[in-house]
Amino acid sequence: MKNTMNTPVAIPVSKLHPFEGHPYKVLDNEEMNTLIESIQTQGILSPLIVRPMENTTDEYEVVSGHRRLHAAVKAGLETVPAFIYALDRDAAAIAVVDSNLHREHILPSEKAFAYKMKYDAIKHQGTSSQFETKQRSDVVLGADSGESRAQVQRYIRLTYLIPELLTMMDEEKIALSVGVELSFLPEQFQYDVLEACEMNDCTPSYSQSWHLHQYYKDGALDKYLIFKTLSEEKANQRETIKVPVNRLRDIIPEGFTVKQTEDFLVKAADYYTRYLHRQRDRER
């Protein structure tokens, strides 16, 4: 089956397969429901892009259009329009990533595995007519995605995280910088981190994850040290009391620094507490 004069052809959905290692999630959410309704009323307006699968007859791998294919199946379509291109694995991998990279909402885990896929493909291609010069793969990838080489490397590091920690990143429970530091820990230590988080009902800070990474590099990390580090109170978890400045303006001496003000209030509270105790003693 071939497309003639660059026109799409109708391909049975049973002959289409997701791209191996496809890094983007296809979710049954509100956006998917909207897409299904659109396909039911208008059909597929933008044809898929597919490539012939090796060692098969009339079987195709989806390069662009995984969500459209999923929605089409949900909508009950038996065939979908698609352009067929004879792409090799590397060119197809790059196209898979590029076709989704500028979506409005991309999860950190999706971006991590997308960057890794494209990085490996560019590296495997070597000198390519597409890029013309022998640049570092992460430099090329960074230029294509609008991110620095260092940021590309950080995202690729996330592919070394266990699935549970990646999910925490996707749910914005831990920051990118935290995930990068934890990615250097062996899998078992990462599961120890996860267990410590669950037991202490906490998430690691950058400082804590950085220290865990350093302990591991020094050969000192063990489960006890992981639990000890993550059980320590973080600065952003300490209880604080906020008092509007206008309530203190007539109390605090003029020209006091923040530190002097804090010390003054602590001493004033201590003095007032002792005063109340003396008053109670007199009333007895």
Model-derived regions: residue spans:
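Amphipathic alpha-helical extensions and coiled-coil-like segments
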Residues: 149-270
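Glutamine-centric residue-chemistry signal
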Residues: 42-46, 125, 130, 190
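Short, charged/polar connector segments at secondary-structure boundaries
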Residues: 1-85, 91-102, 272, 283
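Secondary-structure edge/capping motif, primarily at the C-terminal ends of alpha-helices
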Residues: 126-129, 200, 279
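Amphipathic, charge-rich alpha-helical segments that serve as recognition/docking helices
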Residues: 20, 70-160, 184
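Conserved TIR/SEFIR loop-to-helix hotspot centered on a Trp-containing motif
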Residues: 265-283
